[in-house]
Curated annotation (Swiss-Prot):
Component of the gamma-tubulin ring complex (gTuRC) which mediates microtubule nucleation. The gTuRC regulates the minus-end nucleation of alpha-beta tubulin heterodimers that grow into microtubule protafilaments, a critical step in centrosome duplication and spindle formation. GO terms for molecular function: gamma-tubulin binding; microtubule binding. InterPro entries: GCP, GCP_C, GCP_C_sf, GCP_N. Belongs to the TUBGCP family. The keyword Cytoplasm applies. This is Gamma-tubulin complex component 5. Residues 189-198, 853-864 have a biased composition (Basic and acidic residues). It comes from Mus musculus (Mouse). Residues 529-543 have a biased composition (Low complexity). GO terms for cellular component: centrosome; ciliary basal body; cytosol; gamma-tubulin ring complex; microtubule; spindle pole. PANTHER family: GAMMA TUBULIN COMPLEX PROTEIN, GAMMA-TUBULIN COMPLEX COMPONENT 5. Residues 153-203, 523-545, 853-873 are annotated as: Disordered. The keyword Cytoplasm applies.
Amino acid sequence: MARPKSSGSRMDRQLEHDVCELVRQVTGLQDEADPNFQLALDFVWSNFRFHRFLDVNSHKVEKTIEGIYEKFTIHSDLNKAASWKRLTKEFLNASLPSTEKIKTDAHYSILSLLLCLSDSPSNSNYVETPREKEVEKKDDFDWGKYLMEGEEIGLGPNIDTPNWSEDSDDEDAQQPLSREDSGIQVDRTPLEEQDHNRKGGPQVCWEDEPDSRSWLEQHVVHQYWTTRRFRIPHSAHLHSNLAAVWDQHLYSSDPLYVPDDRVVVTETQVIRETLWLLSGVKKMFIFQLIDGKVTVRNNIIVTHLTHSCLRSVLEQIAAYGQVVFRLQEFIDEVMGHSSESLPPGNGPIPKKQPDAPFRTYQAFMWALYKYFINFKEELTDIEKCVISSDTTITLAIVVNKLAPRLAQLKVLDKVFSTGVAEVPPDTRNVVRASHLLNTLYKAILEYDNVGEASEQTVSLLFSLWVETVRPYLQTVDEWIVHGHLWDGAREFIIQRNKNVPVNHRDFWYATYTLYSVSEKTENEDKVSDSASASSGSDQGPSSRQHTMVSFLKPVLKQIIMAGKSMQLLKNLNCAEGPACQAAARDAERKSLYTLFLESIQLRLQHGEDSAPHIVNEDQTTKENLIKMQSIAERHLELDDIHDPLLAINFARLYLEQSDFHEKFAGGDICVDRSSESVTCQTFELTLRSCLYPHIDKQYLHCCGNLMQTLKRDFRLVEYLQAMRNFFLMEGGDTMYDFYTSIFDKIREKETWQNVSFLNVQLQEAVGQRYPEDSLRLSISFENVDTTKKKLPVHILDGLTLSYKVPWPVDIVISVECQKIYNQVFLLLLQIKWAKYSLDVLLFGELGNAAERSQAKEDIPRDQDTPSQFGPPKESLRQQIHRMFLLRVKLMHFVNSLHNYIMTRILHSTGLEFQHQVEEAKDLDQLIKIHYRYLSTIHDRCLLREKVSFVKEAIMKVLNLALMFAEGWQAGLGAWQMESIEKMESDFKNCHMFLVTILNKAVCRGSFPHLESLALSLMAGMEQS
């Protein structure tokens, strides 16, 4: 546009100069003749002259000022807060150079500009600079005296009485009487009865309307709630006088009928009090609140309805009003507004709870509060329609409009009664919270199964549930993210046992308690979370239905594992690195509840966006449905079920799951609640897709970090390997040096049970190859039953190996685990003792003993004297040969057993165990893997009571081997032929028994790992 011509006004010239200077400063152009300068100048003038901007919002500025004041107060900047409050107040109450008024738009515009500039503050400490206010000099000069100097003023006799002119009276009479104040009531009757002498006085003149007085009379409500009767004008039509006609009929049919004294109200007044009742108003005329119950006044009638008809409708409305009062009372109680302040007779006075309501009740109250806000807005809109009278509004129309809301109130009352009101007052908070959430959850499932008919009800219940579950999800989020289970009101189903510290070895098992309450018996049980976590989704007896929060059952194990893992990580001081980095990451992180809401929104938007896509690709959907139906039919035919309807419903169910559809149909399908959709999204699927993945993700993150920390920083795998090296003797050379020193002492009949000797030998053996483990290993000896000690194989009973496992590795390698390790260790020691005793026997020793025995036979002796010792009838060489054969048989048996235990059991099972340890996702899974590994080797080493007879047979053979080695070492002179024959017979019987038992077990397939041992022992049997 063209540049405006400058006028002679000084302000216009100054404005033009300022605009040119603005263009120079912003664009950098200096020459006014430059075309670019002119374009910029025209643009600025265009914005100044033709653009319109909104006026400043004084309420918004006041709210911002108050918010800054509260912020200063919260941050303990009290000086700043006081200074800010005082300066802004002084500025708003001061006049500006351009105006004398206060709190003008100019004031608020300047403050708005300063507030906008404060969005990018500088980091500086504010110190208020005191300013001296300019005091206006009071003009003491008497201008009146100065100006009236020399003038004579005549004062009349009535100086104190002002002389009002008739013009002023006329002006007063012409003052308009505004009708903005709706409280003014003009009564015509007193005006008509006024004295006629005053008719000539000033009259009230009504402006704006020619008939303002009649307007005021029409818009002021008659006080129908008083005893004074008013005649309500209405039509003379028969339908408008139905009440009178009905009374006339009753009077004509019953001469003794006497009509009651009734108050006639209009239908509009009934509608208005109906809206007030549903809004929560307690003081009304038509509806009365007596002892907490809403009743209808009996003497109310309208002209066009019979008394019974009106009362029937109003009693139904009163029932819904009762629901509103009941829910509002709960809201007030939770918010802290006690009902004790109500006047007597307005309702029952419940006992005030000593403790504040817990967070789940507060969240439920907040959900109801938001619902009633929307409900009251709808009631306000209806009331505005009634006031405007643009359309016909009857009580039936209002009830019809409110029918969906009234149905929702009925559902809310049912949920509130079941979930809150019917719970005994002395019930624990954990039971109250769980019961309320379960009630909402079951109600959603119940109405969701109905389908489209209850879509609004499901939407209402789902919004209530989402709001009510917020504290639970916040508690879960705080626990699985920060490792802190904050639950001051003890409403969460998992409670922390503060008696067990984190660095205790029983932390993983005894720190948390899972509360489970039976609905039938209402008795509270405390179940260890380790048991519940290990059982997964296992349920208790069918006769007990627990009130555990239903929606958390599928992920309860993940929550417990993630929470304990994160707390353990926090205690290890290596969870998230430096605290500043963790705080920064936590500030950027979204809470579990926020992620849940976002997932729900995405799911709903996805369903809405995909509805046209489904309609457009209806043919593709039908083809996929037919394909799924054929698959379902084939699966049903395998079970001899021929049901086409069942098959097509299975097909629809499968199509709902995207992973199944991608696997079999190669695509994706989205469903909605319309009739064209394949099926409807159930509430469980919503939770499975919107809530559970976020919990699983945090579970994998926490437990993965804990496993990595234990393996990397606390050498968990190395400690497990050390247990196998020493207890299971995988460190062969080290343990060989240890136990051979003990075996040599036993063979030489020397004392070896000294604990100091045992520990010295152990330290010397371990310290050479595993110096870091030598300080952790120790051995002790305890005396056992003397009857067992008579047998050579039980001479080692009482040896106990101990390994000091540091925290937190002792959570995995517990004392109970070391007991199982020691049982296997003792068995291996007995087998190696028998094997060592047979291995150290030399053929030369027996040959030298035979030569010495033969030399003794050359000495003449009495042939008739029987020899107590020495070989009987058979020759000495034949006896030596039999002993050689028995030794080989015993060695074959012991070596077969030794190889089976060390290779097939310990080595193979150990490889599987190492692979499972690497794949363990959480500490609980690792503990189970370790226990399963110990249980496996315990069973396969035949240490279980069920197969004790097999172990006894093996122990008998080992005992024979040790007795044979002891006799071999003593020489032939200590043997009798009967002893050798008995030993051969016992060995043969035990051997045959074991082979038979093992073969039967292998043939049944119950113990496949025994197959190698059975084949090895069969190879050593004598062929008949």
